[in-house]
From Swiss-Prot:
One of its GO terms (biological process) is negative regulation of angiogenesis. It comes from the Eukaryota. This is Tubulinyl-Tyr carboxypeptidase 1. It comes from Homo sapiens. Residues 1-59, 299-365 are annotated as: Disordered. Keywords: Carboxypeptidase, Cell cycle, Cytoplasm, Growth arrest, Hydrolase, Protease, Secreted, Ubl conjugation.
Length: 365
């Protein structure tokens, strides 16, 4: 996975440890602090795809055997459900022993008329993601390797629409990319969050979007204000700070934000998604610098698209699009440089659009 620029600078928040910048072999700019090894140890397991195989201190599993789920994975899932659910084994036995479980309807993949406005399309995409429901089992059904080329991830997203199984946040990001490939005027980029609550770290990811200069997000969460945001935020910093406020309402403290680069609209692209172009340490940066770095990242994305190295409007027709829900034009542009990395900030909060409550029984997000 390509490295990005990590920003963990001083800022204005109280006493900050003395630090000196050092360049890691991967090209990620690291800051060595007096906390030294503990700070670096905290960095190593940060992989949103599997959340370090822990979700707020609670282990969770990934189905690596594909579908249909093999018996060993199936039994492990139910054993884990019995362990983490408040009703323990009773709930697993009640579901597995039932003979009259209702048939779950399969949501329809959204389709659009050419005249349908992009904001309405985004609402439909989010509604579809929401209808798949959040996966509370503790076993992620689709294995997502973030280093896979985009074309492989789009094939996986297509499989998600066929299976219509509950998903977690990273799966929702891949699905969101797939379902918006036919919207060339919509910029898409990953936004990852690391928060702290009650002695544990939690990780979450959404798909940031930018349409007509307004920012929003698509995603999946146990909490309605940590996924969908309509494209109504004037700046990237407003969007991120709105997520931070949502975290604050469930007593989570935002620790880090990772911002990726714009994702190509070409479902057949062999390039990888750039997940961590900017890594921002919220505490060390301080409020003003945090906003500045967020806005710098937004400028980087605009400049990259302006230079023709990002995903602009598609220019080439494809007769058959096997990895997109609709037949659409696809972008042949490839990003030329993965080493041009800088992060981006500004503040204001906007009312998020109300979504149905996911009503999780845990405070994990």
């Amino acid at each position: 996975m390509p490295g990005g620029k990590k920003v963990a600078g001083g800022g204005s928040s109280g006493a900050t440890p003395t630090s000196a910048a050092a360049t890691a072999p991967s090209g990620v700019r690291r800051l060595e602090t007096s906390e030294g090894t503990s700070a670096q140890r905290d960095e190593e397991p940060e992989e949103e795809g599997e959340e370090d195989l822990r979700d707020g201190g609670v282990p969770f599993f990934v189905n690596r055997g594909g579908l249909p789920v093999d018996e060993a994975t199936w039994e492990r899932m139910w054993k884990h459900v019995a362990k983490i659910h408040p009703d323990g084994e009773k709930v697993a036995q009640r579901i597995r022993g039932a003979t009259d479980l209702p048939k779950i309807p399969i949501p329809s993949v959204p389709t659009f008329q050419p005249s349908t406005p992009v904001p309405e399309r985004l609402e439909a995409v989010q509604r579809y993601i929401r209808e798949l429901q959040y996966n509370h089992t503790g076993t992620q059904f689709f294995e997502i390797k973030k280093s896979r080329p985009l074309t492989g991830l789009m094939d996986l997203a297509k499989e998600m629409t066929k299976e219509a199984l509950p998903i977690k946040c990273l799966e929702a990001v891949i699905l969101g990319i797939y379902l918006t490939n036919s919207m060339p005027t919509l910029e898409r980029f990953p936004i990852s969050f690391k928060t702290y609550f009650s002695g544990n770290y939690f990780r979450h990811i959404v798909l940031g979007v930018n349409f007509a200069g307004r920012y929003g997000a698509l995603g999946m969460s146990r909490r309605e204000d940590l996924m969908y945001k309509p494209p109504a935020f004037r700046t990237l910093s407003e969007l991120v700070l709105d997520f931070e406020a949502a975290y604050g309402r469930c007593w989570h403290v935002l620790k880090k934000v990772k911002l990726g680069q714009s994702v190509s609209h070409d479902p057949h692209s062999v390039e990888q998604i750039e997940w961590k172009h900017s890594v921002l340490d919220v505490e060390r940066l301080g409020r003003d610098d945090f906003r500045k770095e967020l806005e710098r990242h937004a400028r980087d994305m605009r400049l990259k698209i302006g230079k023709g190295t990002g995903p602009p409007s598609p220019t080439k027709d494809r007769k058959k699009d096997v990895s997109s829900p609709q037949r659409a034009q696809s972008s042949p542009h490839r990003r030329n440089s993965r080493s041009e990395r800088r992060p981006s900030g500004d503040k204001k909060t906007s009312e998020p659009k109300a979504m149905p409550d996911l009503n999780g029984y845990q405070i994990r997000v």
